[in-house]
UniProtKB/Swiss-Prot annotation:
This is Endogenous retrovirus group K member 21 Gag polyprotein. The keyword Iron does not apply. Residues 232-247 have a biased composition (Pro residues). A lipid is attached at residue 2 (N-myristoyl glycine). HERV-K Gag polyprotein contains regions homologous to the matrix (MA), capsid (CA) and nucleocapsid (NC) proteins from infectious retroviruses. Evidence suggests that HERV-K(HML-2) Gag polyprotein can be cleaved into mature MA, CA and NC under certain circumstances. However, the exact boundaries as well as the size of processed Gag proteins have not been precisely determined yet.
């Protein structure tokens, strides 16, 4: 679509730089990528657009009409193109007059002329009509045949040329004077550009020398000056927070001074702050006063405290974060920590922040833990050597001396740091509605839970239930081993009590348990179960206890204590010692009756019935022995099975009657 970005950038390089500077002075920042996209669309649908660019408002209105027609025909115009077109069109409106036909290629000569020195010599009436720090020279000519493009660069890019050392030196802004349209002194206007000469030569041409200024609402208004980094300002004491750094001032030497307090500028400044958390101002700003104001000569300058409330967007983001993620989610803790350490928050700020973000029940918890933390901190302040002069009223922002915002804004850095630490600890103890804080004894690692997740849960519970930091650290290190699963305990056991000083115990435990529960660890456990060999520094052992001696590693039938007792009993009962080798397994000095080996010395399996006698045939029970019927002709041969059953069926049947008994001869 259209030309490539590189061609567009090289073709309109000068015009793009001018447009960016123009928009920047109006308080709008547009990326080069979006501008290149805009000119790609213009190249496609507006081929008449001049290569040197144009400042004519009619041309930009025509561009808008043709882009709308292209959109009606089905062509896709990105939204950023419409936004950039509207911004450029709005920025060019203040520069137009009734006879506006401004082209960048038609602007010869330098448009930056310092009028301060010459205008001071004129009468007060003339100087009041001058509001020219920098005056615009003629920007209208009928042809471009005699255009000097070196001068053209000075016209459009004075700031760039100054940085490169090619342009004229720019003089700083002078006193703000009423806006006027007085002509330039004749000595400062080039001869070729003097309007009187050109008008006489060609009266049909419009005036070529005039001054133009944007409305006061669009003029750049610098921020209030602040004497940060004053040479006589003492450095911040060690161990305390440094003085707040001043915001970076934008240098705009070519913009004329404008009236302060413009309502539009206040809206623009407010909109800039919204959506950019890094631009949030400190609620309490410290500004050192110059010598002579509140301090005598030779004394360090005093510091003036100025309070500024939170922005509505920041409070809204805090409320949405607490509602969506919870007050103690990682996101909210990180956001709160950045706000607390990036701002100089007084007790009033903490109360407003908590009230606007938390539920009533959560705010009650926060206030309760805040008061408890203040009581503990006051005790530590009194016990310090020397004692710290910070009382409970100051840390809570109450009482006759610390109840107002102006009084709290004068708090020392040490008190601000103590309030920050107390409120952060109180915020961490807030519980979600309907949830209870479990005891650290009940936090145990499941068989499939990763060890870092278990330690994170343990630390979270300990942080909410144990206030003392040293006690919390000891409890976490102890429970990290005691409440871990057996696999992690076996990996941590060699490190327990042997972690070198200066190293974090929990970090070493996490390193030792890295990989437990994974595929590689499961394969190692399976190999240990099959082979029983040492793998990865761990030995496969039997985990049960012997019912005879109570020791771990063998069963009762293999208990060495029981075997020794049996050998002693056998020796005392038989009166003789066991043979040299067992006749059964041939690999131990014990009796064969006590041999429990399953393999002989050659590795062949042994039968468990070796010591028993030969099995005997079952005895017949009944009145008469059953003799099989053998038909004639089959003596000495195996009769057929059918004939055997036939013979059995011919036997007398005895139901419930007793069998006949032989008569007893007397």
């Amino acid at each position: 679509m259209g030309q490539t970005k590189s061609k567009i950038k090289s073709k309109y390089a000068s015009y793009l730089s001018f447009i960016k500077i123009l928009l920047k002075r109006g308080g709008v920042k547009v990326s080069t990528k979006n501008l290149i996209k805009l000119f790609q669309i213009i190249e496609q649908f507006c081929p008449w657009f001049p290569e040197q660019g144009t400042l004519d408002l009619k041309d930009w209105k025509r561009i808008g009409k043709e882009l709308k027609q292209a959109g009606r025909k089905g062509n896709i115009i990105p939204l950023t193109v419409w936004n950039d077109w509207a911004i450029i069109k709005a920025a060019l409106e203040p520069f137009q007059t009734e006879e506006d036909s401004i082209s960048v290629s038609d602007a010869p000569g330098s448009c930056i002329i310092d009028c301060n020195e010459n205008t001071r010599k004129k009468s007060q009436k003339e100087t009041e009509g001058l509001h020219c720090e920098y005056a615009a020279e003629p920007v209208m000519a009928q042809s471009t045949q005699n255009v000097d493009y070196n001068q053209l660069q000075e016209v459009i890019y004075p700031e760039t040329l100054k940085l490169e050392g090619k342009g004229p030196e720019l003089v700083g802004p002078s006193e703000s004077k009423p806006r006027g349209t007085s002509p330039l002194p004749a000595g400062q206007v080039p001869v070729t550009l003097q309007p009187q000469t050109q008008v006489k030569e060609n009266k049909t041409q419009p005036p070529v020398a005039y001054q133009y200024w944007p409305p006061a609402e669009l003029q750049y208004r610098p921020p209030p000056e602040s004497q940060y980094g004053y040479p006589g300002m003492p450095p911040a004491p060690q161990g305390r927070a440094p003085y707040p750094q001043p915001p970076t001032r934008r240098l705009n030497p070519t913009a004329p001074p404008s009236r302060q307090g413009s309502e539009l500028h206040e809206i623009i400044d407010k909109s800039r702050k919204e959506g950019d958390t890094e631009a949030w101002q400190f609620p309490v700003m410290l500004e050192p006063m110059p010598p002579g104001e509140g301090a005598q000569e030779g004394e360090p300058p005093t510091v003036e405290a100025r309070y500024k409330s939170f922005s509505i967007k920041m409070l809204k983001d805090m409320k949405e974060g607490v509602k969506q993620y919870g007050p103690n989610s990682p996101y909210m803790r990180t956001l709160l920590d950045s706000i607390a350490h990036g701002h100089r928050l007084i007790p009033y700020d903490w109360e407003i922040l908590a009230k606007s973000s938390l539920l009533p029940s959560q705010f009650l918890q926060f206030k309760t833990w805040w008061i408890d933390g203040v009581q503990e901190q006051v005790q530590r302040n009194r016990a310090a050597n020397p004692p710290v002069n910070i009382d409970a009223d100051q840390l809570l922002g109450i009482g006759q001396n610390w109840s107002t915002i102006s009084q709290q804004a004068l708090m020392q850095n040490e008190a601000i740091e103590q309030v920050r630490a107390i409120c952060l600890r109180a915020w961490e103890k807030i519980q979600d509605p309907g949830s209870t804080c479990p005891s650290f004894n009940t936090v145990r690692q499941s068989s499939k839970e990763p060890y870092p997740d278990f330690v994170a849960r343990l630390q979270d519970v300990a942080q909410k239930s144990i206030a003392d930091e040293k006690a919390r650290k000891v409890i976490v290190e102890l429970m990290a081993y005691e409440n871990a699963n057996p696999e992690c305990q076996s990996a941590i056991k060699p490190l327990k009590g042997k972690v070198p000083a200066g190293s974090d115990v929990i970090s070493e435990y996490v390193k030792a348990c890295d990989g437990i529960g994974g595929a590689m660890h499961k394969a190692m456990l399976m190999a240990q179960a099959i082979t029983g060999v040492v793998l990865g520094g761990q030995v496969r052992t039997f985990g049960g206890k012997c019912y005879n001696c109570g020791q771990i590693g063998h069963l009762k039938k293999n208990c060495p204590v029981l075997n020794k007792q049996n050998i002693t009993i056998q020796a005392t009962t038989t009166g003789r010692e066991p043979p040299d080798l067992c006749p059964r397994c041939k690999k131990g000095k014990h009796w064969a009756s006590q041999c429990r080996s399953k393999f002989d010395k050659n590795g062949q399996p042994l039968s468990g019935n070796e010591q028993r006698g030969q099995p005997q045939a079952p005895q017949q029970t009944g009145a008469f022995p059953i003799q099989p019927f053998v038909p004639q002709g089959f003596q000495g041969q195996q009769p057929p099975l059918s004939q055997v059953f036939q013979g059995i069926s011919q036997l007398p049947q005895y139901n419930n009657c007793p069998p006949p008994q032989a008569a007893v001869q007397q």
